[in-house]
Amino acid sequence: MSRLRDPRIEWREGLPYSPIFEDVYFSREGGPAEVEHVFLDGNRLTERFARTAGLFRIGEIGFGTGLNFLVCAQRFLEAAPKTAGLEFVSVEGLPLSKTDLKRALDTALVGHAAQTLSHELIAAYPEPLLPGFFGRELFGGRVRLLLLLGEATEMLSELQSPPLNAWFLDGFAPARNPELWSAALFREVRRLSARETSFATFSAAAVVRDGLGELGFAIEKCAGFANKKHMLRGFLEVGETPAELRPPRSAIVVGGGLAGAAVTRSLARRGVQVTLIEEQSELAALASGNPVGVAVPVLTAEPTHLSRLTRAGLDGLHQELSKPGGDAIVCGEPGALHLGFNEYFERRFERGLRGPDALPAGFARPVNPSEASEIAGLNVMGGGVYFGQALVLRPRALTQLRTSASGVQLLLRHRVKRLLREDGEWLALDAQGHKLAHASCLVLACAHEVENLEMPLERPVALPLVKVRGQLLFYPANDRSADLRVPVCYDGYITPALDGQHCIGATFEHWNTESAIDPEQSKKLHDRAAGFVPAFAPVPDGSDWTRQARVAFRTTSRDRLPIVGALKDAADPQANGLYISTALGSRGLVFSGLAGELTAELILGRAQSIEGSLSAALKPERFVLRAKKKAAAARARKHRRRPKTG
């Protein structure tokens, strides 16, 4: 993934100026008026918004100051029916800081109706800035901004979305920014378009006119804004007209832990009626029921699927918890220490923080033992990394919050045993064959219980699920340990005191199916914690302290990544309304919200909130595809080794 570049913005006569491209970000004659003339009128958006019944999708090259987005959003909120939604996808390779963004918008929007919207955008703007996709639900949920930070062509190639309705081709002029306006970029614009997708751009350059014209866009040259003589607008006149998407109105979610609750929330807040079925007598009764947990990203020497997914998941978690009710879920201030507990991790930290793809200090920064102890509030053994965005949360409370939305029906104490598909609907049946619920689609979020379900699939995709035992210890706070300010992570973790006790976690035991508390494992957890934080060395009073613990079983996959996507029949690989979100492992707090959003986006036909390469790494069929690829490679090697005859 490409690195983000510093725009090195300057301010000239009160306007933001790019010394890299030697031009201002918006017109001196009036930024909002320019947006309205070039992009809104150029795409005839006011009249199109008024006719929109469902979702209108816009793609933009060059987010810049966010001015185009805000002026467009204001017009949409004014002109579109209340039932309509706007999905605005914008790419930016040189993103402004939040400070510069605010200054630019404060300057540009004086006296304009969109000024009232700028505060919400600024508050939600990513900080610190990292490469990747960043989804933001704004303005009462009617507008979704999907911000793609990175090189434009690369980011668009990662975008998985239904065809867009219109394009804002902004960015600096081709003469000043020739790398942007490439044939590869135009091909991505074409890929993400359908017949009658429109575009508008301030530029009338031949490279734009020819690049789009060769791909089937009808081009019209028309009057530009203010002193600019010409601009271009047009539409795609080839290809197929996309079929109207009819998202399901109802869904069944099986599983009442973090994963199922997240899917429920993501569907319900988009208007889907959800029936959530849980076998236990309460939500979050099993692995999601820990009283406290730590949401922390993974740091790797180079960006990997795992590290990028944890960054995306943590960003989404911050957005989710910024909504009403989120304050009650968060314990203390953000931040966590991760100590380098062996040479391998120390080398990994070193490369991840100081290499060419180094993360910004606001996200992760190295700390020596003295700095680590100061951050922790007590003495810790060794240095490591401080993650400023990490969170300590109440998982059970988060699960309950996610299922509190309107349109959610809870069925507790019901076990789904069999799934049927009849007349285009999914049915969930219990062991006696009684129908528990029916809906247009069904999501399995019941961890390893997926393996016990009877499904109407002729050749179901094999899911290599692994059941992993985890035991954590509740350690009563003492006078010294109570000073711990942030969680300390190593190959385990210690949380600050909550309700008079710390949580020390957690074992990760494959193939151990014992559900009883193991005192020896409690002792090992305690000894390991004391080795990193001496304040935890005292042995608690009482002979039964090792039994102040909790055991639960996580579900993970063979490659330690979640399994999220459409669950297809290998005999009929068309999507049939059956989906899965499971195998979150020990990272349920980080992954569950992201998996829930991705599942809802797949079901409802929305632009995906993570890169296509990441969503592909989560698909249920990935294990089968890898096995086929491995077998083909083995056959090829065998063929090459075969001796020649004759």
Language-model features: locations:
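A conserved short coil-to-beta-strand element within the FAD-binding core of flavoproteins
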Residues: 412-426
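C-terminal catalytic lobe of FAD-dependent flavoproteins
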Residues: 539-646
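S-adenosyl-L-methionine
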Residues: 104-158
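Rossmann-like AdoMet
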Residues: 1-56, 73-110, 621
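Helix-loop-beta segment of a Rossmann-like dinucleotide-binding subdomain
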Residues: 112-113, 117, 301-302, 327-338, ...
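Dinucleotide-binding Rossmann-like beta1-alpha1 core, especially the glycine-rich loop
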Residues: 292-375
